[in-house]
Amino acid sequence: MNWEVEVIRKKEDLIRDTQEFLRINSVMDETTAGPGKPFGEGVNASLTSLLELGEKEGFTTKNLDGFAGHIEWGEGDDIIGVLCHVDVVPPGDGWTSDPFSAEIRNGRIYARGAIDDKGPTMAAFYALKIVKDMNLPLSKRVRMIIGTDEESDWRCVEHYFKHEEMPTMGFAPDADFPIINAEKGIIDASLLIPHRPNQAEPKAVLVSFQSGLRLNMVPDAAEAVIEGPKNEEILSSFKDMLRTTDQKGEAAIENGQLILRMYGLSCHAMEPNNGINAGILLCEFLQQTELDDAGKRFVQVVTDKFSGDTRGKKLDIDCEDEISGELTLNVGTLRYKEGQGGELGINIRYPVTAESKVIRDTFESASEFELGEFKDSKPHHVSADHPLVKTLQKVYEGQLGKKADLISIGGGTYARSLKAGVAFGPLFPGRPDSAHQKDEYIEIDDLLRSTALYAQAIYELAK
């Protein structure tokens, strides 16, 4: 069978449906949540549109209270899972085109969710459609499981697997090719910096500080509001810093308050070194000013414990292993309010052989901050000799003529929600990863190639 030819036959429909899918703003918005739409109207619209497309094509579909859904084809006791998600991270600013216009330029579709994960989700859907339309005999059911809260708390899969059976094995089209069989553990933690009263009359009061939208994104913007007789002096110093460095920002005095804004570069938290943390940058500047005691303490904790360190060395939690590499640490959100104290939202990706308890114990014994929330998603590893891995290697090597090496990532995919699950694409080796960045895109050629790989993978696993 020539899987590439089958995909080319559906090329125009695949591109059209992918664009229409991407035009739905599916950023979680709990202000519009309600019965049957727990994560807001946009996420729900994206889920229902895909389920309706599945129903139209003759698949069995199911919506589980708006938390998740599935699209199924085939018969048998065993289930092959294809785990996708329709929610996306906030687009942020600085896009060349509207992040939800799904504009095509230079052979690419640009949109939030193009590569993470709505583009690959549509590729998987068309792969299943190809298997169905070719009337290929299957001995197992193939089930696309569609999540809606992957970018936040995974409440979708938690709800789904309370009500539905676990697939025998499966893959998530939500990372890199060839095959990812190891995923680091993921910790989301909040570190609280309690307010302490000033010992003397301050010359500059940190009124507020805010940076970051999600723990799994490096913050690309930060804002500090300052009051006091030192405003003009701090403003001048800030402008000098911008003039003499390559850092980007802006500042102004409005209604007696000094507002400082710093800009960085967002990226996925799995490798914070690919971005520039605007929150930490702004704290580094503020460290040089004469802030009030409480504000100074907040800034000091950030700079002492996180400046220039994405590996947790300053916190004494750094570690690594041969399977999955180094621990990474991202300060995804930074918040401070005068009289209330501060809070840092931390995202940690730790090696598959490491113990999260060691990290928790370190945080709980720290004197600089208090540990608030601590969420831990355990590491995931599937053996290299597992039939799932062997089958996907055969598919990849057969279609592309390249060795299907096994790799590990710091990102967390739905594959870890399965007992036997791996991530399989959509990002091909050598391609830049635009996920969670402005001007996110998917190469149309890669959309087609991944669809062909998914179609054969589905058939080989379920035949």
UniProtKB/Swiss-Prot annotation:
InterPro entries the UniProt entry points to: ArgE/DapE_CS, Bact_exopeptidase_dim_dom, M20A_pepV-rel, Peptidase_M20, Peptidase_M20A
Keyword Transcription found: no
GO biological process: L-arginine biosynthetic process; proteolysis
PROSITE patterns referenced in this protein's UniProt entry, alphabetically: ARGE_DAPE_CPG2_2 (PS00759)
UniProt keyword Transport, yes or no: no
Binding positions for Zn(2+) 2 per the UniProt entry: H85, D116, D174
EC number: 3.4.13.-
Protein origin, superkingdom: Bacteria
Molecular function GO terms recorded: acetylornithine deacetylase activity; dipeptidase activity; metallopeptidase activity; zinc ion binding
SUPFAM superfamilies according to UniProt: Bacterial exopeptidase dimerisation domain (SSF55031), Zn-dependent exopeptidases (SSF53187)
Enzyme class: hydrolase
Signal peptide (UniProt feature, chain positions): none
Binding site for Zn(2+) 1: D116, E151, H436
Keywords assigned by UniProt, alphabetized: Dipeptidase, Hydrolase, Metal-binding, Metalloprotease, Protease, Zinc
Cofactor(s) recorded in Swiss-Prot or TrEMBL: Zn(2+)
Stated family: Belongs to the peptidase M20A family.
Protein's UniProt name: Putative dipeptidase YtjP
Lineage: Bacteria, Bacillati, Bacillota, Bacilli, Bacillales
